[in-house]
Structures are given as C-alpha cells and as structure tokens.
Amino acid sequence: MMGVVSLPRVIGKQVYGSLYECDTTVLGEQKVLEQIVRKAAEEGNMTLLDVKAWKIGDGVSIVAIVLESHITIHTWPEYNFATVDVYSCGSHTDPRKAFLYIVKELKARRYTMNEADRSSEF
C-alpha cells in the first residue's frame, strides 16, 4: 500500500475591510486603539510581538506584529472611518474573530469584510 505524500503548505488567512460611521471618540485615541489591537490579537489566538502607533493628523495608524503576521488599523476621525487588515499564517488562528472584535470596539454602524485565502502548496 502506498503512503499519502503531503506537500509543504504555507497557511495564509487574510480578513480586511472598511469600517463606516465609527465612534469618533475612539478613532483619534492612540492608547485606546493600542489596547483594542492587543485584545484583537488575543481574540484571534495570535501571539503578539509588538505594537507601534503613529498619530497622523487627527487619525492614528496602528501596526501590531504578531508571530503569525500582522494586524493594522488606520483611522480618519474626520470621516468616522477606519480600515482594518488582519493577516495570519497560523492554522490555529482566527483572523475573522480578531477583525469582528475591532468592528465591535470601533462601534462601526456598517462595514465591509473581505476574506482571502492566501495559502499555497509547493
């Protein structure tokens, strides 16, 4: 009987989208957004390595480096708008759960959510 040959596989799960009509009191608060991205990593079962944040005009850009890849949030309080990207190379992670946690915390009244399978077999 022949054994099954498994090919090397790279896992890639990406969830990204736009958040509209968000709570403006949160969108400009760097420290609050840092806490949100930290908790989002936990919600998505990701291993947080570092968080960097920059105040840009009234908005904030947050980049969380997780062992499995990254989480980003970019905000525009003047438009009640944010974009979010959660990408993971870990089969044990749930980027969708992390994304939806951010949607909830930014109190988005509506949002788009896109999911991409960026996995590859070699």
Swiss-Prot record:
Cofactor(s) required for function per UniProt: pyruvate
InterPro entries for the chain: AdoMetDC_fam_prok (IPR003826), S-AdoMet_deCO2ase_core (IPR016067), S-AdoMet_deCOase_pro-enz (IPR017716)
UniProt keyword annotation of Lyase present: yes
GO BP, sorted A to Z: spermidine biosynthetic process
Pfam family membership, one: AdoMet_dc
Changes after translation: Is synthesized initially as an inactive proenzyme. Formation of the active enzyme involves a self-maturation process in which the active site pyruvoyl group is generated from an internal serine residue via an autocatalytic post-translational modification. Two non-identical subunits are generated from the proenzyme in this reaction, and the pyruvate is formed at the N-terminus of the alpha chain, which is derived from the carboxyl end of the proenzyme.
Keyword S-adenosyl-L-methionine: yes
Catalytic activity entry: S-adenosyl-L-methionine + H(+) = S-adenosyl 3-(methylsulfanyl)propylamine + CO2
EC code(s) of this entry: 4.1.1.50
Keywords: Autocatalytic cleavage, Decarboxylase, Lyase, Polyamine biosynthesis, Pyruvate, S-adenosyl-L-methionine, Schiff base, Spermidine biosynthesis, Zymogen
Gene Ontology cellular component terms for the protein in this record: cytosol
Modified residues (Pyruvic acid (Ser)): 69
PANTHER family: S-ADENOSYLMETHIONINE DECARBOXYLASE PROENZYME
Family recorded in the similarity comment: Belongs to the prokaryotic AdoMetDC family. Type 1 subfamily.
Function: Catalyzes the decarboxylation of S-adenosylmethionine to S-adenosylmethioninamine (dcAdoMet), the propylamine donor required for the synthesis of the polyamines spermine and spermidine from the diamine putrescine.
Designated name of the protein: S-adenosylmethionine decarboxylase proenzyme
Annotated organism of origin: Sulfolobus acidocaldarius (strain ATCC 33909 / DSM 639 / JCM 8929 / NBRC 15157 / NCIMB 11770)
Taxonomic lineage: Archaea, Thermoproteota, Thermoprotei, Sulfolobales, Sulfolobaceae
